[in-house]
C-alpha cells in the first residue's frame, strides 16, 4: 500500500502543478466543516497557492461545523459556493432508507446513497464552471475501497449513471428527485469532466496531527470543534443507534481500528471515546440526544428501523 501511496503522491503533485496553469478557479474543494476538509482547504490554498472554490452541500450539517466553515472561509479569504437542496428531499431520503436498510446496516445504507449525492453535486458545479479537479477530504479507507482508491475512475465519472438501483426501482422517488444523482449522459458529447481526487490517500495521514494543525491555524473556535465526534452529521447519531440496535456493534469501529493499526489515529483517544460514543447513543444522552431529534424530524418509530433489502441494493457503481 505504501508503494501505491507514493505513486499517488507523485500524481497529486503533478496534478496540482497542472492546475496552477489553468485560468479561473483552479480547483473545487469540498468543505463539510470537519477537520479534514478544513485542513485540505488550507493546504491547497496556502501551502500550494491554488485559486480554489470552496464547495459545501448544506444538508444536515451541524452548527459546530458551520462555525468552522465560516471561520475558515474568513481566514483564508476564498470564494465559497453553497448548494442548498430542498430539506424535504433529504428528510424523505433518510426516512425511506432507514425503513428499508440493506444487511450492512444504516450507516452503510444511508452513507453510500448520501455521499454520491454530495459527490455528484461537486462534479456538477466543477463541470459547469470548467474547474479541472475536485478535491475531497476523504481519509484513507473512505469511501469504500472498492469504489475509490485516491480518485474515482474515469469510467465512473464519464460514462456511469450513479442512481442507486434500489431507489430507482422503489417507485418512491420522482424522476426529478432521482435526477440529482450524477449521470454524465445528460451532458453534451465532448463535455470535459473534472477529476475527483482524495489527497489524504496520497499524503501522510495523521488524525491527531491534523487536529493540532487546524487548532494552531485558528480554523476552529476551540479544539473540541475539530473532533470527528463533535462535528459529525446529526443524522449519523441515528444511523449508529440503528446499527447498535440491529447489528450489535458500531460500524465505524473497523474504520478507526484500521487507522489506529496504521498509526494514523490515536489508540489512547479512541480507547476512551469509542465506548463513550456508544454509551451516549444507547442512552440518547449528551450528543446522543441527536438520536431522538433526528427520529422526530424523520417521523420514525424505533420499530421502523428495519433491514429488509438484499445486499448491495443501493450500492453506487464502482
What are these regions (language model features)?
Residues 27-36:
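Short, glycine-rich nucleotide/cofactor-binding loops
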Residues 39-40:
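Hydrophobic positions on the alpha1 helix immediately C-terminal to the Walker A/P-loop
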Residues 1-24, 43-318:
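Nucleotide-activated chemistry modules centered on ATP-dependent adenylation/adenylyltransferase
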Amino acid at each position: 500500500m505504501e508503494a501505491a501511496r507514493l505513486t499517488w503522491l507523485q500524481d497529486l503533485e503533478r496534478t496540482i502543478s497542472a492546475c496552477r496553469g489553468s485560468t479561473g478557479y483552479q480547483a473545487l474543494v469540498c468543505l463539510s466543516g470537519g477537520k479534514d476538509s478544513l485542513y485540505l482547504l488550507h493546504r491547497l490554498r496556502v501551502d500550494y497557492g491554488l485559486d480554489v472554490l470552496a464547495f459545501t452541500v448544506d444538508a444536515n450539517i451541524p452548527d459546530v461545523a458551520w462555525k468552522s466553515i465560516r471561520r475558515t472561509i474568513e481566514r483564508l479569504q476564498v470564494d465559497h459556493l453553497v448548494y442548498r437542496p430542498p430539506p424535504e428531499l433529504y428528510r424523505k431520503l433518510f426516512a425511506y432508507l432507514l425503513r428499508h436498510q440493506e444487511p450492512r446496516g444504516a450507516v452503510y445504507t444511508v452513507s453510500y446513497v448520501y455521499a454520491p449525492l454530495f459527490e455528484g453535486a461537486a462534479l456538477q458545479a466543477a463541470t459547469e464552471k470548467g474547474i479541472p479537479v475536485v478535491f475531497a477530504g476523504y481519509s484513507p479507507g473512505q469511501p469504500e475501497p472498492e469504489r475509490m482508491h485516491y480518485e474515482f475512475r474515469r469510467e465512473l465519472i464519464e460514462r456511469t449513471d450513479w442512481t442507486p438501483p434500489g431507489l430507482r426501482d422503489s417507485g418512491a422517488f420522482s424522476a426529478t428527485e432521482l435526477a440529482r444523482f450524477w449521470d454524465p449522459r445528460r451532458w453534451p458529447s465532448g463535455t470535459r469532466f473534472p477529476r475527483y481526487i482524495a489527497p489524504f490517500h496520497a499524503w501522510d495521514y495523521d488524525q491527531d496531527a491534523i487536529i493540532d494543525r487546524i487548532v494552531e491555524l485558528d480554523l476552529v473556535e476551540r479544539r473540541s470543534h475539530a473532533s470527528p465526534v463533535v462535528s459529525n452529521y446529526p443524522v449519523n447519531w441515528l444511523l449508529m443507534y440503528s446499527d447498535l440496535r440491529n447489528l450489535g456493534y458500531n460500524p465505524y469501529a473497523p474504520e478507526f481500528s484500521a487507522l489506529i493499526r496504521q498509526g494514523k489515529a490515536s489508540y489512547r483517544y479512541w480507547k476512551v471515546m469509542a465506548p463513550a460514543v456508544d454509551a451516549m447513543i444507547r442512552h440518547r444522552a449528551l450528543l446522543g440526544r441527536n438520536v431522538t431529534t433526528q427520529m422526530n424530524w424523520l417521523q420514525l418509530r424505533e420499530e421502523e428501523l428495519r433491514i429488509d433489502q438484499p445486499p448491495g441494493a443501493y450500492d453506487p457503481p464502482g
